Amino acid sequence: SGSKTANIGDGCFGVRLDHIGTTSGMGCGRPRPKPTPGGS
């Protein structure tokens, strides 16, 4: 689940909540707020 997270979760919610952050879009509304440690 690191590939998909690094893709959109990189600037959204690049943590372990890829399945949650991707669905809920926690901060995913922006193009890329900030590279969260974990999405890479």
UniProtKB/Swiss-Prot annotation:
UniProt keyword terms in alphabetical order: Disulfide bond, Hypotensive agent, Secreted, Toxin, Vasoactive, Vasodilator
InterPro entries: Natr_peptide (IPR000663), Natr_peptide_CS (IPR030480)
Predominant place of localization: secreted
Organism annotation: Pseudechis porphyriacus (Red-bellied black snake)
GO CC, one annotated term: extracellular region
Disulfide bond residue pairs: C12-C28
Role, per record: Snake venom natriuretic peptide that targets both NPR1 and NPR2. Exhibits hypotensive and vasodepressor activities.
Propeptide: 1-8
Annotated protein name in UniProt: Natriuretic peptide PpNP-b
Tissue expr: Expressed by the venom gland.
GO-annotated biological processes: regulation of blood pressure; vasodilation
Subcellular location: Secreted
One function term, GO molecular function aspect: hormone activity
Region Disordered, residue ranges: 20-40
Family: Belongs to the natriuretic peptide family.
